[in-house]
Amino acid sequence: VIIGFFSNSYGDIENTNNTNTNETSAYYDVNDIPDYSGEAYITINNNVPYFNENDYTTKSFETYSELDVLGRCGVAYANICKEIMPTQERGDISDVKPTGWKQKKYNGEYLYNRCHLIGHQLAGEDANELNLITGTRYFNVTGMLPFENKVAEYIQDNPNNHVLYRVTPIFKGDNLVANGVEMEAYSVEDKGKNVCFNVFVYNIQPGINIDYSTGESSKK
């Protein structure tokens, strides 16, 4: 398994196409993302990921961006396969405090989770600060988890296959909390027949106002 790190430079445009360089290629502006309207996610680019032919490989790898100058996570990119999936229970991640971590309870439940960009069930990463962002329960469970499960179930059913998987946190300006993430996936051996998606998942919590610049929150 190859595990790598690459530098990340953030601007107003937050989609990185070439994960082997520091160049950023914009497909949409964060300001063009429509406001949350009741659905946990929207599709991007007709649900087709932005991978190119050079990305398709059957070699396993994991790549995580360095934290930027504000301490924020960048693109996380992997070729998910049985080889890199965890073989033991998830470890403790409570020592990691991602940017914007201003935890509060509402109705007896914590607002924020430490959200894996590449889910633990896919790559076995525990307290990797390059892979954890501040996200709401709704974002984590209702938004990201169904897509993670789709990839995990495909690999479980096809243990010799691979899924290219990239998660890009989308920050507006210098905000410390991401507005959401772009999730892209493509099953390599069957050329996307069983897994192929490109979605933006909203980092919101119904009934709660979030100040994305700081992580502070309040009831609506």
Outline where the language-model segments fall.
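N-terminal, intrinsically disordered, polar/charged segments of Gram-positive cell-envelope systems
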Residues: 9-60
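Domain-level detector of nuclease and nuclease-like folds
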Residues: 51-220
